[in-house]
């Protein structure tokens, strides 16, 4: 959600900010609705005062034994007019909120310009892709040859973009999630939370998935949606809350199933586990003081990088350009891991600073003791990391010529000391 006061004061700046995202100017429309709403509210306030005054006069006239019918009729007329204006005010509120809810966040000044992902800027890279003495296979070939990935069984059960994992590979995925969670809790200062995977629409509105991206969500019977990411539930833990400034920063992490319809992904990554309807992810969420959110984004990104470093997976960090930053974010770094089977880097984590955009939508605030009023918190979220894609990266980077897969040292304690899959 956007700050109406800021739009009133600097409408040109608001339109220029939207232009960075290749959007048409919207300040005139927003301010017109705002002006109409304020005019109706002023008229309602005036009528309220007239009604109160007339009601007092009715009491005085009746007390003196006079005829108050004219005043009674006047009050009735005022009430009827007010009812119509209140309905009009409700319509204007919904229209204004609808327009504001459909507009993306204002980008940080440091976000690179560009129309799409082709203009993203590499910030740094870590690790050197392994030189194979054989042609590396893709993860689904490895998984099927080890008897640990069954896409046909998943298709019989649920259709396309699902997988059944078995045996050592199922255990490896579980180990990855547990490793990530333990790392963030014990060394990165995050508190583990377990949240529902079913949420109501207001939670999705708060983080920005609704109303604009309804087609990307799975809706179940009743008022529930399956979460596309634990960002939704974990961030909404501060919805409607006023936190003490001393409680900030609040850092939380969750390991959940995630569900996405992949409505715009027809024909993309149709084989394997890169793009699925159901997948596991470890999510990091930070709730911070506005002055600290820029530094927190760097910290969060480093926490996600630490996962890949400890697994010794080569990766690069990309600063997303204006045309590629997500709806709710003001700035985003993507971590892309090297996949030798595809001979390319693929996204495995996205870390974003949303500023006060989500906080305004969900009314998450903080208060400094001794100061008047409250302020909106800043919220950040990041994958720490996508577990399924990390499994893909491990299988491809640690594959051996004999068809086995070496287990990264960081995971062997979670695998009962197992050193190789397929032995």
Curated annotation (Swiss-Prot):
PROSITE patterns: AA_TRNA_LIGASE_II (PS50862). Keywords: Aminoacyl-tRNA synthetase, ATP-binding, Cytoplasm, Ligase, Nucleotide-binding, Protein biosynthesis. Pfam families: Seryl_tRNA_N, tRNA-synt_2b. Its main location: cytoplasm. Pathway: Aminoacyl-tRNA biosynthesis; selenocysteinyl-tRNA(Sec) biosynthesis; L-seryl-tRNA(Sec) from L-serine and tRNA(Sec): step 1/1. The keyword Aminoacyl-tRNA synthetase applies. GO terms for molecular function: ATP binding; serine-tRNA ligase activity. Disulfide bonds: none annotated. InterPro entries: aa-tRNA-synt_IIb (IPR002314), aa-tRNA-synth_II (IPR006195), aa-tRNA-synth_II/BPL/LPL (IPR045864), Ser-tRNA-ligase_type_1 (IPR002317), Ser-tRNA-synth_1_N (IPR015866), SerRS_1_N_sf (IPR042103), SerRS_core (IPR033729), tRNA-bd_arm (IPR010978). One of its GO terms (biological process) is selenocysteine biosynthetic process. ATP binds at residues 260-262, 347-350. It comes from the Bacteria. It is an enzyme of class 6 (ligase). Belongs to the class-II aminoacyl-tRNA synthetase family. Type-1 seryl-tRNA synthetase subfamily. Homodimer. The tRNA molecule binds across the dimer. Catalyzes the attachment of serine to tRNA(Ser). Is also able to aminoacylate tRNA(Sec) with serine, to form the misacylated tRNA L-seryl-tRNA(Sec), which will be further converted into selenocysteinyl-tRNA(Sec). Consists of two distinct domains, a catalytic core and a N-terminal extension that is involved in tRNA binding. This is Serine--tRNA ligase. It comes from Rhodospirillum rubrum (strain ATCC 11170 / ATH 1.1.1 / DSM 467 / LMG 4362 / NCIMB 8255 / S1).
């Amino acid at each position: 959600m956007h700050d109406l006061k800021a739009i009133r004061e600097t409408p040109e700046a608001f339109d220029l900010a939207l232009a960075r995202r290749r959007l048409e100017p919207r300040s005139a429309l927003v301010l017109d609705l705002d002006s109409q709403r304020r005019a109706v509210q002023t008229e309602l306030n005036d009528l309220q005062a007239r009604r109160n005054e007339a009601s007092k006069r009715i009491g005085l006239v009746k007390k003196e034994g006079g005829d108050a019918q004219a005043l009674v009729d006047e009050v009735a007329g005022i009430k009827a007019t007010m009812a119509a204006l209140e309905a009009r005010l409700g319509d204007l509120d919904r229209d204004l909120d609808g327009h504001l809810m459909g507009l993306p966040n204002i980008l940080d000044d440091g976000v690179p310009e560009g129309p799409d992902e082709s203009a993203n800027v590499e910030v740094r890279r870590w690790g050197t892709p392994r030189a194979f003495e054989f042609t590396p296979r893709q993860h689904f070939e490895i998984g099927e040859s080890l008897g640990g990935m069954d896409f046909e069984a998943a298709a019989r059960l649920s259709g396309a973009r699902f997988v059944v994992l078995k045996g050592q590979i199922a255990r490896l995925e579980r180990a990855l999630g547990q490793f990530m969670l333990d790392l963030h809790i014990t060394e990165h200062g995050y508190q583990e939370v377990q949240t529902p995977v079913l949420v109501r629409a207001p939670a999705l509105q708060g983080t920005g998935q609704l109303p604009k991206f309804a087609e990307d969500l799975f809706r179940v019977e009743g008022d529930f949606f399956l979460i596309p990411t634990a960002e939704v539930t974990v961030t909404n833990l501060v919805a409607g809350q006023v936190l003490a400034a001393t409680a900030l920063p609040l850092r939380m992490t969750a390991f959940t199933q995630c569900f996405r319809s992949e409505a715009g992904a027809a024909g993309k990554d149709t084989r394997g586990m890169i793009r699925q309807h159901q997948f596991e992810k470890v999510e990091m969420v930070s709730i911070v003081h506005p002055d600290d959110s820029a530094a927190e984004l760097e910290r969060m990104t480093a926490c996600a990088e630490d996962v890949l470093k400890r697994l010794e997976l080569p990766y690069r960090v990309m600063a997303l350009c204006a045309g590629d930053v997500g709806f709710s974010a003001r700035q985003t770094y993507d971590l892309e891991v090297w996949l030798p089977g595809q001979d390319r880097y693929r996204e495995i984590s996205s870390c974003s600073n949303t500023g006060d955009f989500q906080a305004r939508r969900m009314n998450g605030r903080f208060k400094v003791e001794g100061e008047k009023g409250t302020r909106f918190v800043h919220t950040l979220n990041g994958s720490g990391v996508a577990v399924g894609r990390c499994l893909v990266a491990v299988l491809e980077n640690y594959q051996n010529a004999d068809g086995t897969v070496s287990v990264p040292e960081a995971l062997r304690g979670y695998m009962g000391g197992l050193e190789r899959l397929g032995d």
